Amino acid sequence: MHYLDNLLLNTDSYKASHWLQYPPGTDASFFYVESRGGVYDQTAFFGLQSILKEAINRPVTHADIDDAKALLAAHGEPFNEAGWRDIVDRLGGQLPIRIRAVPEGCVVPTHNVLMTIESTDAKAFWVPSYLETLLLRVWYPVTVATVSWQVKQIVRDFLQRTSDDPEGQLPFKLHDFGARGVSSLGSAALGGAAHLVNFLGTDTLSALLLARAHYHTPVAGYSIPAAEHSTITSWGREREVDAYRNMLTQFARPGAIVAVVSDSYDIYRAIREHWGTTLREEIIASGATVVIRPDSGDPVDVVEQCLLLLDEAFGHQVNGKGYKVLNHVRVIQGDGINPQSLRAILERITAAGYAADNVAFGMGGALLQKVDRDTQKFALKCSAVRVDGAWIDVYKDPITDQGKQSKRGRLTLLRDRATGQYRSALLDEVATHAGDSDDALVTVWENGQMLREWTLEQVRAHADAARL
């Protein structure tokens, strides 16, 4: 077993003491997860299925308990040994909880319930709280999926305005370059898979492995041959054109796409003299599309200038919407890309008369790493407990920050059948609104069993159906 695989130690230290802190007579608890606002006013839900399969799919064992007991005693925390041993002996080590969640891929306005966790055994009412640490990590894939989804809406808008084939172009317009800039292999896999909810382009191989293992998708994303600086500069400055010619020799075939970073020395000279003059006829004869990648400078200015220079060399066609589409070549910008700079680039080239077909984008750290739990203000809170047989509301309402006010009661998420709009509601309200709304939450996990799974294809369909 891996040294991090003990579920009992996949929590915050203080959680080990919480079973002693509830009111006498407590025998059930109810928790929920929401985005309390943030950078974006909608979130694309994704990643819970993977977290559940990774973190709680294995029953708790007495060996786990022995390990946790020894470590927590040395660490300075009390430990509910009797409670955990009862779960192993009486329940076979399966966690007595029910988890309900919005279907993965659904895009839900912030300030709404996204998932709930409730106890199913009176003696183990404290288990949902113990799992907060690992379950709230869903903030990460949800936030990455949300950033990626928001970018997709930006790109879709410009494609619809300037392209003859917006839906055909869209899936490969944002490429994941983030594997090397993320905090861990696991984060690369989970965050990379979250991006693949919205796009098909990625260089994060671990994301393909996660999608294959957890979302029933043999190959979730695609890439193309591409140069890096070392494969160009190793030829030497004087042989730069030979490095580019080698890329054509190795990869340029009819219908193929090959990307070549071209700013190792002078991006503008590379386009004018090498790509646009010396190699021009070779590119045309190859039948391939060569994608030039600038990797420095101001992204907005550099992309526009590259398009202008490539247009001088290769010319363009004017599409049905009156925008220019370059012949034989494209540009991909992967340096300095975030939702704001991406929009600025598209605004600039649109104003210059170029279709969004001409450019693609890569995002690395801004996609997988420059996010945190506060990007969308994620929280997992207790909203109800049952004490002496009666449910009571549980909530916080700090006078120093009204934004941290939590919801109260046993909750769910309703979706209006006519408008598709979501709103959080009490479970008791579901029957009242049965005529006009559906309960949007689905039981995905109960008492050690995964009850509902989504394929990545289904997740993508949910996300693609939503709009800003």
Curated annotation (Swiss-Prot):
ATP-dependent autophosphorylation plays a vital role in nicotinamide binding and enzyme activation. Activity is inhibited by FK866. CDD domains: PBEF_like. GO terms for biological process: NAD biosynthetic process. Beta-nicotinamide D-ribonucleotide binds at residues 203, 335, 373. Changing residue 180 to A: Loss of activity. Changing residue 293 to A: Almost no change in activity. Changing residue 373 to A: Loss of activity. Transmembrane segments: none annotated. It is an enzyme of class 2 (transferase). Changing residue 332 to F: Blocks the tunnel, results in a 403-fold decrease in catalytic efficiency with nicotinamide and shows a weaker binding affinity for the inhibitor FK866. Pathway: Cofactor biosynthesis; NAD(+) biosynthesis; nicotinamide D-ribonucleotide from 5-phospho-alpha-D-ribose 1-diphosphate and nicotinamide: step 1/1. Keywords: Glycosyltransferase, Phosphoprotein, Pyridine nucleotide biosynthesis, Transferase. Disruption phenotype: The deletion mutant is able to grow in the minimal medium MMX, similar to the wild-type strain. The XC_0719-XC_1067/nadE double deletion mutant is only able to grow in MMX supplemented with NAD(+), but not in MMX alone. Belongs to the NAPRTase family. Both protomers contribute to the formation of the active site. Contains two distinct NAM binding sites, one NAM molecule binds in the catalytic site and the other binds in a lateral tunnel that connects the active site. The binding of NAM molecules in these two sites is positively cooperative. The NAM binding tunnel is important for both catalysis and inhibitor binding. This is Nicotinamide phosphoribosyltransferase.
